[in-house]
Amino acid sequence: MIPLIHQTPRLTLLAASRALLTAELHKPRYFPVLLGAVLPTDWPPGEYDEDAMRFFLDQLTAGGRTAAGWYGWYAIRKATPTSPKTLVGAGGFMGPPDASGTAEIGYSIAADWRGQGLATELVTGLIEQAERTGMVRRLIAHTLPDNPASQQVLLANGFQTMGLDPEGRVRFERIVEPQAL
């Protein structure tokens, strides 16, 4: 079974569940209570929109327990003496790895929390999570050509630029060294 919580120095990464996604989509005032964290004012961030939430919920519903951990992950900044636990971003995988061991990741950080290295830390955590599954051999990611901050996050995490994909996005790849649980 895939671990559904992953810790980094400043973040707790929590795998999305059907209950969390349902609350996020349909009962937003209960979502932070279930999550146990304060929401930023601009939630949801970036490309993590209602369509992404619905996609993750549909995939978790269709895939049952085997789908857990292969879709959305919430990035919660750990409490400090001056601030409570706060949801700062979302990321995750677009599904389990394919037959060759390739999985795709994506991520978004709330505007109020950008520029603090949290996206880099979130991606590091997703890479570590992929390694922990023992199933992923290669990760891919895409950014828009006019998003240098996102490109820097990937480069800082050992991804290499592979050129443009057919949709005009910059494609990145990274080899993963799987580690059995």
Where are these regions (language model features)?
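GNAT-family acyltransferases
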Residues: 1-104, 109-112, 125-133, 144-146, ...
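Conserved active-site tyrosine of GNAT-family acetyltransferases
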Residues: 154
